[in-house]
Amino acid sequence: MGQTVTTPLSLTLDHWKDVERTAHNQSVEIRKRRWVTLCSAEWPTFNVGWPRDGTFNPDIITQVKIKVFSSGPHGHPDQVPYIVTWEALAADPPPWVKPFVHPKPPPLLLPPSAPSLPPEPPFPTPPQSSLYPALTSPLNTKPRPQVLPDSGGPLIDLLTEDPPPYRDPGPSSSDGNGGSGEVAPTEGAPDSSPMVSRLRGRREPPVADSTTSQAFPLRQGGNGQFQYWPFSSSDLYNWKNNNPSFSEDPAKLTALIESVLLTHQPTWDDCQQLLGTLLTGEEKQRVLLEARKAVRGEDGRPTQLPNDINDAFPLERPDWDYNTQRGRNHLVHYRQLLLAGLQNAGRSPTNLAKVKGITQGPNESPSAFLERLKEAYRRYTPYDPEDPGQETNVAMSFIWQSAPDIGRKLERLEDLKSKTLGDLVREAEKIFNKRETPEEREERIRRETEEKEERRRAEDEQREKERDRRRHREMSKLLATVISGQRQDRQGGERRRPQLDHDQCAYCKEKGHWARDCPKKPRGPRGPRPQASLLTLDDQGGQGQEPPPEPRITLKVGGQPVTFLVDTGAQHSVLTQNPGPLSDKSAWVQGATGGKRYRWTTDRRVHLATGKVTHSFLHVPDCPYPLLGRHLLTKLKAQIHFEGSGAQVVGPMGQPLQVLTLNIEDEYRLHETSKGPDVPLGSTWLSDFPQAWAETGGMGLAFRQAPLIISLKATSTPVSIKQYPMSQEARLGIKPHIQRLLDQGILVPCQSPWNTPLLPVKKPGTNDYRPVQDLREVNKRVEDIHPTVPNPYNLLSGLPPSHQWYTVLDLKDAFFCLRLHPTSQSLFAFEWKDPEMGISGQLTWTRLPQGFKNSPTLFDEALHRDLADFRIQHPDLILLQYVDDLLLAATSELDCQQGTRALLQTLGDLGYRASAKKAQICQKQVKYLGYLLKEGQRWLTEARKETVMGQPTPKTPRQLREFLGTAGLCRLWIPGFAEMAAPLYPLTKTGTLFKWGPDQQKAYQEIKQALLTAPALGLPDLTKPFELFVDEKQGYAKGVLTQKLGPWRRPVAYLSKKLDPVAAGWPPCLRMVAAIAVLTKDVGKLTMGQPLVILAPHAVEALVKQPPDRWLSNARMTHYQALLLDTDRVQFGPIVALNPATLLPLPEEGLQHDCLDILAEAHGTRPDLTDQPLPDADHTWYTDGSSFLQEGQRRAGAAVTTETEVIWAKALPAGTSAQRAELIALTQALKMAAGKKLNVYTDSRYAFATAHIHGEIYRRRGLLTSEGKEIKNKDEILALLKALFLPKRLSIIHCPGHQKGNHAEARGNRMADQAAREVATRETPETSTLLIENSAPYTREHFHYTVTDIKDLTKLGATYDDAKKCWVYQGKPVMPDQFTFELLDFLHQLTHLSFSKTKALLERSYSPSYMLNRDRTLKDITETCKACAQVNASKSAVKQGTRVRGHRPGTHWEIDFTEVKPGLYGYKYLLVFVDTFSGWVEAFPTKKETAKVVTKKLLEEIFPRFGMPQVLGTDNGPAFVSKVSQTVADLLGVDWKLHCAYRPQSSGQVERMNRTIKETLTKLTLATGSRDWVLLLPLALYRARNTPGPHGLTPYEILYGAPPPLVNFPDPDMAKVTHNPSLQAHLQALYLVQHEVWRPLAAAYQEQLDRPVVPHPFRVGDTVWVRRHQTKNLEPRWKGPYTVLLTTPTALKVDGIAAWIHAAHVKAADTRIEPPAESTWRVQRSQNPLKIRLTRGTS
């Protein structure tokens, strides 16, 4: 009890040295990690019974060995060493294995005797319990002697025995009574445990007629006393390993423990051992806590008394004697409480999603599925599935979660509500048993396929016959045309034969005989007439000849395929169809029939075989065929060959031209020249290494790599995205790939909650498709791992220049070499249907899929691990790996060939496959990662250059980003790339206006030109030091990294980068320090920490060692010193002068300068500015600024004083900071001392530093912070810097603030501080910010009165004041009309208040001037404000109109859809028909809101009952405006009227009926308690049809001429009144009554129509605003203005909006508002000669 369990796997790991010795004896090698993986993960999946902990059973080992040694693709040759070693350990076991080897039957042994306890007098049997059986009375038999096994060995076979609990062996029987003598073996078998009995049954011959008994830890012995038999270790081991954990399946483990408690009667210690073995520590504590909660007190309720709880369920070992009645009672009670604790602790939190996730399996019976469903209810919900109240929920779950075919049929059962759960199970069983077998399904699919093929074959034959018949008919017509043409040529025209004389022969043209007597005419039978040749060149110009085959080619222009005729005689290419917008350029085209002017198209993007280009075509509609001219043929690099089969147009390399589309970053591959390898792979390399090539070795499998387990994020849930629609061409294109992957086992069928769509991608240049899975949603839910894929930027740094023989290998289908663990395969499922293969469901990958975000990293790491031994074994070779691209470099050709052979052998042995087509073996020049490697240097390939050069001028930010991204890949070859591209980068920012100007075009051309002249760069040699030449210009760092090659310096990389805003504002010497630091950090990626010598035209080392603290912050200073003063890695060379073009040193020396001196001179703004007092100063002033809080408001003031008096003081606006006030005071002092010598004292460090140091720094960096934002107090700083130059001589001195001395400095500072506080407290601060350089405000001298102003003033009675030089009215100067307009317009722009509110504000406020024409000007401003017109609401002045109604029932209907929630049985909508004459309503519940539903109900419900309607009125819903509905209406002659959009009053009758029906349904559901609104709909319709209308009549009375049947229902016995005269009279009077009702109603409706309606005031040509019905955040309420084109009394149509607009949704626009831009109309021709195209443009 409590001992550690030993398994075969752990046993082998503990004796691993012996295992390796056994493997060595078998001549194999094994690895410990691989040993564990195969035993615990791989071999259990063979389904031969191999346990995860291993076994030494020879039968199971043999089964696994058969699987491993299986021939073909299903074998596992890599696992042979391991299974052979397992077999050797089992066949010849070492001493530590022997106890675990499957035993042979031992000789007969007597069973051991059980220890007995001292006898006690018999005791009464405890009362029987429903949980535990009664103990049987002891048998009076003598126990047989028992031979105990060796204590050193295991008691039982831990691996071959079945786990308890055991089946009850049944009641024991005995033929004789016990005695004191020796008892025969057949009568006195002792009590033993079931395990011992089972072992004895296996290892001993069975004992005949032996007495059987129950073996428990507590059992009653032969002497009446209880004996204790502890649990065996094998019981506990088997219970734990053959049952799920408590957290996984608490019900199953609880049932196991319940059976153990029931049958074994364990003691308190046994219970603790059982719980400790089967439960975790946390689970055990939870069970014990729940059990203690279940302890009940004397009242039968759970108690909280600790004494009672500890007595009933102690946590420490109690003193319970199981040989006493009391002790056994305690144990029984303890077990009951323990079982209750297990049940309560096993209850999971309520999780209905878990219940919903239980679905029926493909081959699972309905009854088994129902049991699983009920178990889920018990486990994850607090409901009991057996409770009758929960039967409905369980039944619904059973229906919805059954198999799709069973669920659909169960949903269609009649009277589904009355079905019980048992009825549903029986129906499901019937459906399940009637399913077709797999053989029947295959037979059905085969039969359907054959029928489909037969129909297709018949259709093809019919089409072929029709095509032949049509071809023969056309050929006959053609022959007739040819022959008739030839006859006409012979009979007339210039070719008519001369007229014969009367005696002239028509055959030989001689006279004297006729043709029938001509001796020269051949005699004999007439031969067959030769067929007319239509395609010969010697046909003498006969009519009707078919032209020779014309070379054609299909290109994609503007995204559409266009078939061109190749015409080398055409200079330009021609389009005949309408190409869209045309440019303003035109050209004169000279053709065979004359000349004509045609226009050019705008630039179109054309997909060529050489890439995407933009091209402008001539639009010639008269041309019979689109022409491919010489200009585009030149871009295409086309070649035309004339052969016997006709003309062929091919590309530059002889390949057929096709439509091509690809990513822009891969475009360089289009220009690559496909050169075959120098070494013939087919002869030697392919045959020597067949397993290393994909062409000969098949699909690879990295068998050394364990299956990959993909980890999900903690909050991830399965995502299911349906498959996108796929064309037939694409489906047929990817079908062979799917079939191939299925045959190879890479794809397998599955059922998964995950699903992502499959995308067919067409391969460039071919018609082949390849399947690509969209795994973006899966990638979002998978855990991110750190990417370890090498950086291509510095990957080649590990390739020394001495290795100049290269081999490049590209692994094919690399990701498919790694296996996926079965638990992770379901993540990558997708849909696939193929009736021919019998597949209709999901497929998933068993290998690592492409498109998965972690695939490159996982494969790169796996390949690195597998190739680690190769790198160790070949230290002289350089092997670089970038995912699946390998580069092997050697110093000689022989080493390269030997290394390549070893690498191919290694790859083949490891299970990887290389592509022979892409292999470059043992060459001195190879292409790797888009670069050309040759002689220790790397070049830009011509393909990459042509890619950049072939890109058109960018027109959008996206195109510019594409260009910069493509060119940026080549920036190492372009000196100063960052400086060249500087004008381009601002245009790529979001929200920036894309304006391509001369600067951008110049930068664009410079980058292309630099790319054409790109030099070769040497590969970094890590054995040599590096030299970095750095220069800086206008905030851009430029440098070149070089290495010595003999006497020369060979460039390794060109570097350039833009400095940050702070560094860009420094003096030149400090900018050089920043440039060196930036480039040194970038260079570290290439130098790999090797020594670096920095050469620059500045003494940088001295600046770094003693940096000026005025310019650099401490953090930046520390960073620069740590980076540049690392003497072990970075050294500074002598100062050199650099060539601006090459960045290399010039032969002559540059100008010498001292950087420290220059910095000292450049730190200030004014050179003579000092901080020491001037002895001859004209003034000595003190400045101060004060900012403080007073009564919750921040007050501020500034002052300039002497020691005794205030020179200047002013209050500043509220909220002004103290720093700003100090700047203002200092600036004011400098301005007042213009042209004088000044000493000025300030106690502000901020103002003092700004004037002396920081102001100049801010100015140099553009007044920006380190984050690129604008600094605070920008205007005040600029004003201060400008004012520094006003005094003749200046000294700004800092003095401590708040001094208490009596010297002049302290007195002046106190005076300035006091003056600033007093002025801030005394004066009211201004409402606007003080501007240093503010223009003077308007005064009366600026008033200029116009002639109109003077006339208005004269009428007003104003007088002119000569003294004030202005007009005066009511004692106030009069403001001119123009000034009034400017002031009021500015005020309105700030507030956008209405006329009345603005006027009220002006009247309440005091104004020192009188505003001339204030009210008129203000009204004009408010009425013409465009923003107010677009936003302000407007009251509708349109009066309500009158609806048109029918003249009799059934002629005029209004229709509408309304949504009813919640939906029931799939019904979500209600289709409502209302007869406008009578108000009669018909309503139908529908599942969809479609035109098909409308027409179906109209034809099947309305037409048969009410006749064909004449008018239908609806809104503009999709179901009513669709072509289906309108076509049906046209065919039936129905006038379908569409009402105004967003105007429900137009359909007011049906809209009101919708509301009535919904309100009635709501009341009915509340009254009845039912949610079935479909069932309650007839009652709602009954109410609507019997509700009196406006004229006091109900729709029922109007329609049927009788009162509504509300109370007097007819007698059920209708036979009595069938022939009643009163009934007949009533029926006869019905016709008359209806007419008496209908005529007055029709007259009343007509009277409403005849009543005059006041129309809206809008007329054709007016300008109106249109209401925006769906506004977004901060979007104006009105749009426009628009021009009115058509009007009706209630609606109007405007220019630019297709639908009619109700007059209530528009408002007049003021004509003075800026009108919309004038439109110009352009007429264009179309393909149809009877149509023209009108295009409107803005002039």
Curated annotation (Swiss-Prot):
Its cofactor is Mg(2+). The keyword Phosphoprotein applies. The RT polymerase active site binds 2 magnesium ions. A motif (PPXY motif) lies at residues 163-166. GO terms for cellular component: host cell late endosome membrane; host cell plasma membrane; host multivesicular body; membrane; viral nucleocapsid. One of its GO terms (molecular function) is DNA binding. Residues 111-127 have a biased composition (Pro residues). The keyword Transmembrane helix does not apply. Residues 111-222, 435-500, 514-553 are annotated as: Disordered. Residues 346-394 are annotated as: Interaction with host PIAS4. One of its GO terms (biological process) is virion assembly. Mg(2+) 2 binds at D1184, E1222, D1243, D1313. Gene3D superfamilies: 1.10.340.70, 2.30.30.850, 3.10.20.370, 3.30.70.270, Acid Proteases, Gamma-retroviral matrix domain, HIV Type 1 Reverse Transcriptase, subunit A, domain 1, Human Immunodeficiency Virus Type 1 Capsid Protein. A zinc finger (HHCC-type) spans 1388-1428. A motif (PTAP/PSAP motif) lies at residues 112-115. Residues 435-467, 487-500 have a biased composition (Basic and acidic residues). Residues 431-436 are annotated as: Interaction with host UBE2I. A motif (LYPX(n)L motif) lies at residues 131-135. This is Gag-Pol polyprotein. It comes from Friend murine leukemia virus (isolate 57). The gene is pol.
